Amino acid sequence: MAGNVFGQMFRITTWGESHGKAVGVVVDGLPAGLPFSEADIQKELDRRRPGQSEVSTPRHEADRVEILSGIFEGMSTGTPVSMLVWNSDARSSAYDVIKDTPRPGHADFTYMARYGMRDHRGGGRSSARETIGRVAGGALAKLLLSRFGILIAGHVLELGALRAKPLSFEEILENVEKTPVRCADLEAAEKMLEKVAALRQEGDSIGGIVELIIRGVPAGLGEPVFDRLDADLAKALMSIPAVKGFEIGAGFEAARLYGSEMNDPFRIKEGKITTSSNNAGGILGGISTGLDIVCRAAVKPTPSIGKVQQTVDLKTLENTEIAIKGRHDPTIPPRMVPVAEAMVALVIADHMLRSGFINPRTLLE
């Protein structure tokens, strides 16, 4: 299986399966001289850890990270950073009943079509548990970017038909962890919690939209034509399980606007070139403008639901039905926020190194 590596100069390789012994990541390209510890990584992993609230799976995993290489006396050495997390609460027997019946909305059928076999225990490699490696690698990317004044704020903008009101970057950072649904509009968050609770009782699930704001990115970041910054952000977010759509700035709304409405007029502010609006979402021609980069990912409802669904029996090739049991998230967006933040951090860190905005030697000066 290929496709386990992401990035060019700042590169991660994730490994492991949902019900295997462990999952982890190898990070290549982290410059020498960055102070970090297991606590820095653990802080991010704890944000995506299951079993913490009524909006996540009841699977209980400590998700304690172990750093195996790439660090000496509390600093990165410039060599590969290898990290792992042991799986401890996998209940594989719950998945025996679906061994020969592909779950609607899951990768069961497509993995069989591609590889001729699949690990049916929790989805194997296609499980969202793979994202532990992304979050661990992204934690290092976020630490690196913070040294250069780049910060990332993610939150749940929509859950089903419920949408948060417009909020500032600072409000998102302040409020996002105050509620299990990670919606920074606390009034909307309460309604979202009620909706999730009702759907859980019904054996159903709900999707939503995760919004990300990246602040502090300098103008001039990006590698046209095929390595456009927005294209790489789209790939990063679309690679996350359950993501079905991506937009940046005005996004699909841009198709409904006139040019006079969509264009962001240039002006001088405090001696610097800026724009009076940001419909472009901080990127023009695949290159950053210096304004906030604003992008969103559309997340489908959790496909594992308790309702009876139509499927097929792979052995008999007959139609049948399935009602999925086990421990599953009633909604994905809240736990996806730290994963999405990690992925965009990896993209920005990679481009900062590729463009020369980060000189690997400067961390030691």
From Swiss-Prot:
Give a yes or no for keyword Cytoplasm in this entry.
no
Q: Which reaction does it catalyse?
A: 5-O-(1-carboxyvinyl)-3-phosphoshikimate = chorismate + phosphate
Query: So, what pathway does this thing act in?
Result: Metabolic intermediate biosynthesis; chorismate biosynthesis; chorismate from D-erythrose 4-phosphate and phosphoenolpyruvate: step 7/7
Stored InterPro entries = Chorismate_synth, Chorismate_synth_AroC_sf, Chorismate_synthase_CS
Q: Which residues bind NADP(+)?
A: 48
Q: Which cofactor does it need?
A: FMNH2
Query: Pfam families recorded for this chain?
Result: Chorismate_synt (PF01264)
Alphabetical keyword list: Amino-acid biosynthesis, Aromatic amino acid biosynthesis, FAD, Flavoprotein, FMN, Lyase, NADP
PROSITE patterns per record:
CHORISMATE_SYNTHASE_1 (PS00787), CHORISMATE_SYNTHASE_2 (PS00788), CHORISMATE_SYNTHASE_3 (PS00789)
The UniProt entry's GO biological process terms, in alphabetical order, are: amino acid biosynthetic process; aromatic amino acid family biosynthetic process; chorismate biosynthetic process
Q: Name one GO molecular function term.
A: chorismate synthase activity
Q: What is its EC number?
A: 4.2.3.5
GO CC annotations? cytosol
State where FMN binds: 125-127, 285, 300-304, 327
The note on cofactor binding and number reads: Reduced FMN (FMNH(2)).
Q: Where is this region: Disordered?
A: 41-61
Q: What class of enzyme is it?
A: lyase
* Protein role: This reaction introduces a second double bond into the aromatic ring system.
The family assignment reads: Belongs to the chorismate synthase family.
From the Swiss-Prot or TrEMBL record, give the protein name.
Chorismate synthase
Lineage of the source organism?
Answer: Archaea, Methanobacteriati, Methanobacteriota, Stenosarchaea group, Methanomicrobia
